[in-house]
A protein has these predicted regions:
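Glycine-rich, proline-tolerant flexible connector loops at the mouths of alpha/beta enzymes
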Residues: 1-19, 69-76, 129-145
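Active-site glycine-rich loop that binds ribose-phosphate moieties when present
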Residues: 83-90, 108-122
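Flavin-dependent oxidoreductase catalytic cores
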Residues: 9-39, 45
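Active-site mouth loops of central-metabolism enzymes
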Residues: 33-47, 98-112, 186
């Protein structure tokens, strides 16, 4: 599925290397644990789990961020983020697997704290945000998330905040196309 709902892509989509191969090289050469993102909604559940098991076993990647689709209004052919998180944490890891799972947090999304709780219940141990250029939504989301955790008597999962420099107007246009909120004064 492509991203036609957003209009014309402002930057040409480049052919990319296999992220798990890059992750393995990063681990081998630099000596740090890699975290690999995996979009799970575009292929069937069994194909996703096979990829995840191979990534853990053959590439020695132990940290994954499980990513969904661009919109909750689209019916994707693959499993949901929560289905995959649940399968990894409750089945794969309990049978000898060793994957530390995370998820994506999008601070501008309404009621994102509920999504974080649900992902945590299904096995997400940490979250990383979409790239941030405005602090208001992340401050609000963290506050709501802490309140929900307190109400449920559970602990908040680690939240990694993502930042990136912008060097051109073309970068800004692409980030906006991706759905990143950038204040007009930026």
């Amino acid at each position: 599925l492509d991203e036609n709902g957003r209009g014309k892509r402002p930057v040409v989509n480049q052919k990319r290397g296999e992220p798990r191969e890059f992750g393995r090289l990063l681990q081998d050469i630099v000596g740090v644990e890699a975290i690999v993102n995996r979009v799970v909604v575009h292929e069937p559940f069994d194909a996703q789990m096979k990829w995840i098991e191979e990534t853990n076993r053959d590439y020695e990647i132990e940290n994954l961020i499980i990513v969904g689709g661009e919109s909750s209004n689209v019916k994707y052919p693959g499993p949901s983020v929560n289905e995959v998180l649940h399968s990894i944490s409750r089945e794969y890891n309990e049978n000898g697997g060793d994957i530390f799972c995370g998820g994506i947090a999008i601070p501008s999304r309404t009621a994102e704290s509920k999504n974080l709780i649900k992902k945590s219940e299904n096995g997400s141990e940490f979250f990383t945000t979409q790239v941030l250029y405005d602090s208001s939504n992340i401050i609000k989301m963290i506050g709501h998330y802490q309140e929900r955790c307190d109400e449920l008597n559970t602990f908040p999962r680690r939240l990694l905040l993502s930042f990136a420099p912008v060097s051109s107007q073309k970068n800004i246009e692409f980030l906006k196309w991706l759905g990143v909120e950038i204040p007009s004064e930026t």
